[in-house]
């Protein structure tokens, strides 16, 4: 399994808009991609820093997404991202979770 990690900063006062856009627009795009296994997004309360990870069954499928839909996703986030996101693809070496629950979104 492979992980695409994207880290970026949000523009001021866009936390709620980011959450809406991610849930309404981006998750459906990811879900339609071949080999997509899941997504986890991290943010520190009160911070502009966000780390979004997507899980892929193979490097090939992660790369296909990168060439096919990633730029469209960046366009969807253009109103909330400040600067250029940093992207890295890595292999999952170990995982202990099967299911996780997410925290309720907190207004920034």
Please state what every model-predicted region is.
Residues 3-8, 38-66:
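Short, well-ordered beta-strand segments in beta-rich or mixed alpha/beta enzyme
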Residues 9-22:
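Short, surface-exposed ligand-recognition loops at beta-strand->loop->(often short) alpha-helix junctions
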Residues 10-12, 58, 91-94:
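Non-catalytic surface loops within mature trypsin-like serine protease
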Residues 19, 63, 92-94:
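A beta-strand edge to alpha-helix "cap/lid" segment located at domain peripheries
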Residues 24-37, 55-89:
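An amphipathic, aromatic/His-enriched active-site/gating alpha helix that lines ligand/cofactor pockets
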Residues 40-49, 75-108:
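Glycine-rich beta-strand-turn "strand-cap" elements at beta-sheet edges
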């Amino acid at each position: 399994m492979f992980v695409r990690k994207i880290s970026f900063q949000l523009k001021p006062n866009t936390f709620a808009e980011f959450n809406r856009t991610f849930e309404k627009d981006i998750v459906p795009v990811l879900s339609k991609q071949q080999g997509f296994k899941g997504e986890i997004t991290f943010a520190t309360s009160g911070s502009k820093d966000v780390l979004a990870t997507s899980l892929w069954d193979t490097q090939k499928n992660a790369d296909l997404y990168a060439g096919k839909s990633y730029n469209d996703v960046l366009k969807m986030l253009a109103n909330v991202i400040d600067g250029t996101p940093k992207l890295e693809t890595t292999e999952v070496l170990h995982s202990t979770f099967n299911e996780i629950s997410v925290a309720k979104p907190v207004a920034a």
